[in-house]
């Protein structure tokens, strides 16, 4: 006969296994050792490539106009001198250098997965790309297609073309929004070759609907413009607002599409936390001082307003402000914002985050966790705290530095992990998989966590 102690232990073990079974980790969709393109820009096309051929004329540079003093503490946008010296050997006219292509953003919309490739080194054929899931979805390491076409990605062919894009966003009107930083972030040779700009593309026609150059009076350079969040209701597409965090200058920019105007908010909550800037990721130990990095919009309230949740990357705190405050241009000129900007609380130790996104179907915000190499979650109906902050997945081997997180219209979370600290401070091993894209339904990702 089985002893009571054995039965109790068996029951506990079974409950633990059931709890583990309820949890649904992120699913690896794609992985790459090095990135490749259908059109590398060298005149040699892979299957499915276009016959566009780039011009290699020198870019137009504004010498010294946007220069900044060297920073003693670095952001994620800086490169150490020891690493910069290795990049000096790159051919400045090379159209494609495989090692230099590090993907940053991933956004899905109806069978197309948009993947960005910021120009932090030479040899990047196209900064804005996509994967056709119907055609290439079965390939675990698919090549990228330039979007909306290869020609528009050739910054040195026209002053109207794309320079460098970090992340994208799809709005309720089926439009793709992104910031072109206008900057070539080459080691020891950072160049602001044109003004940073906001772009809007119609995903039904792939036509550019709008390009807005950010004036120098608002943002001196595009160096800190790494993401964009769009606030618009379906059926009111002309009345869109875009919220753009500046991680370098620690500001929040608001662009109004209808009036074609942009304004800038400043607040202490946009600064990095000096106690949260020491990081250890992928075997690299370093210090970053990235300020406000990500903004996500919560559920619509009875009065029609929405909360805008935000955080600096070098911080474990979450903050909030009403979108009504941001949309009033006159508020940006105030010297004191009173209690309009609020501290919600800390997510807990080692929860520094790049991007986060709110899922309306579950009421949960999901976070990229760079220290934990994973994805976290918080149910917005609960107070934010370490106890109410959950872990969806964590993988120190395969999910090194999750750089982007977005949720599509079907409630699927998409995450990019790109080993960026290893690329910046050491050397990527090109014999192993360095870049991955993951996905999971938000309704499943929260199972078995405190975010239920």
From Swiss-Prot:
Its EC number is 5.3.3.12. One of its GO terms (cellular component) is extracellular region. Coiled coil: none annotated. GO terms for molecular function: dopachrome isomerase activity; dopaminechrome tautomerase activity. Residues 1-23 form the signal peptide. Disulfide bonds: none annotated. It is an enzyme of class 5 (isomerase). Pathway: Pigment biosynthesis; melanin biosynthesis. InterPro entries: 6-blade_b-propeller_TolB-like, Royal_jelly/protein_yellow. One of its GO terms (biological process) is indole-containing compound biosynthetic process. It catalyses: L-dopachrome = 5,6-dihydroxyindole-2-carboxylate. It holds the Pfam family MRJP. It is found in: Secreted. Gene3D superfamilies: TolB, C-terminal domain (2.120.10.30). Glycans are attached at residues 93, 156. Keywords: Glycoprotein, Isomerase, Melanin biosynthesis, Secreted, Signal. The keyword Transport does not apply. Tautomerization of L-dopachrome with decarboxylation to give 5,6-dihydroxyindole (DHI). Also catalyzes the tautomerization of the methyl ester of L-dopachrome and dopamine chrome. May play a role in melanization reactions during late pupal and adult stages. Belongs to the major royal jelly protein family. This is L-dopachrome tautomerase yellow-f2. The gene is yellow-f2.
